[in-house]
Amino acid sequence: MAKKLFIETHGCQMNEYDSSRMADLLGEHQALEVTENAAEADVILLNTCSIREKAQEKVFSKLGMWRELKQQNPDLVIGVGGCVASQEGAAIRERAPYVDVVFGPQTLHRLPEMIDAARSTRKPQVDVSFPEIEKFDRLPEPRVDGPTAFVSVMEGCSKYCSFCVVPYTRGEEVSRPFDDVIAEVIHLAENGVREVTLLGQNVNGFRGLTHDGRLADFAELLRVVAAVDGIERIRYTTSHPLEFSDALIQAHAEVPELVKFIHLPVQSGSDRVLAAMKRNHTVLEYKSRIRKLKAAVPDICISSDFIVGFPGETEKDFEQTMKLVEDVGFDFSFSFIYSARPGTPAADLADDLPEEVKKQRLQILQSRIHQQGYEISRRMVGSTQRILVTDFSKKDPGMLQGRTENNRIVNFRCDNPRLIGQFAQVHIDDALPHSLRGTLIDSTLH
């Protein structure tokens, strides 16, 4: 009987990508088959996130649930990876001594040998080092599962925002070689992928070495990815305003494969708070980027990240954030109440804003952005949208599901599985709070 691998992933799309590569790696080197049931697994891996305090506590809660499985099966290997592993290292075993393997985001390629060593020596294996981009050289070609795929193009971040742990858990920015990224995209396209999402903590800071020794920027990478036969849509995340260049904006105007959606985190609409966050740009500079982008692509939709209740945030600071929300017209956000992360400069700042005030501000922010997003969705009713069909609807097996260019989920009546992976013209009939509903007009089956 084949041995089983269970992976649970917390956090960002980079972690989702890393988890898929772990499955590829262990499938090739140890013939492990992925299971959705931790109780039947021979190897359990938890890919962690340390951005939020609650996410970190969630790690040890989950490990506690698996302790009984380890007691029942001493041969079970439990591994912890991702950013909590990178941050805590061997200290994870102080709270969870039954963990066998601890690895960081940059050492996941060493998993086969670490698992083997844990089994043969019965001793814990810990490696949370930063061997730059070596992991990509030792990973197999990615397996394709559907018409969309993630492609990591760079790792780490060198911006050192005062609130953020990423530079400490994933290291400084390192870009993959340009040709390696293109080769991975070609492989995906040849196996049916039609939409790629390029990933990086600061993805538009990509500077990849080409075969002729040049450094190619992100705008050039986008143009070459768009030229790959079979790739019809390109998304990317996450961007930093400092790296959102005129060349990148021009690419949005000229490359039709780039979707009409961008995620550009701003965190706050107050210059005073942005300075304390060490974001190294002003609100005016951010709005200037947005104005140029909207001039290049008038119907583009924009989402962002916000932190509410950063130490020292006043009512005036929050009002300035809400003004930015109105001025830009964000239609979606990842927004959170500030939580201090150990080891970051902001953790030393006095955080004396009452929790109730923080919660109230977050509710106001999220409510307004949700309203703006819903207004955009309502304006789409009556239009015809080109949808990339990705799967059956999660709520109704008689419906298919896809996504618009501006990142709306669309459900429509159709039970033909051959349409999955294809593009379809769908008339939008109704706007729901979190999705659209439509009617299939036309599709192109290959």
UniProtKB/Swiss-Prot annotation:
Residues 143-375 form the Radical SAM core domain. Keywords: 4Fe-4S, Cytoplasm, Iron, Iron-sulfur, Metal-binding, S-adenosyl-L-methionine, Transferase, tRNA processing. One of its GO terms (biological process) is tRNA methylthiolation. It holds the Pfam family TRAM. SUPFAM superfamilies: Radical SAM enzymes. [4Fe-4S] cluster 2 binds at C157, C161, C164. [4Fe-4S] cluster 1 binds at C12, C49, C83. Binds 2 [4Fe-4S] clusters. One cluster is coordinated with 3 cysteines and an exchangeable S-adenosyl-L-methionine. Its cofactor is [4Fe-4S] cluster. It catalyses: N(6)-dimethylallyladenosine(37) in tRNA + (sulfur carrier)-SH + AH2 + 2 S-adenosyl-L-methionine = 2-methylsulfanyl-N(6)-dimethylallyladenosine(37) in tRNA + (sulfur carrier)-H + 5'-deoxyadenosine + L-methionine + A + S-adenosyl-L-homocysteine + 2 H(+). Its EC number is 2.8.4.3. NCBIfam families: miaB-methiolase, MiaB/RimO family radical SAM methylthiotransferase. Catalyzes the methylthiolation of N6-(dimethylallyl)adenosine (i(6)A), leading to the formation of 2-methylthio-N6-(dimethylallyl)adenosine (ms(2)i(6)A) at position 37 in tRNAs that read codons beginning with uridine. Belongs to the methylthiotransferase family. MiaB subfamily. Monomer. This is tRNA-2-methylthio-N(6)-dimethylallyladenosine synthase. The gene is miaB.
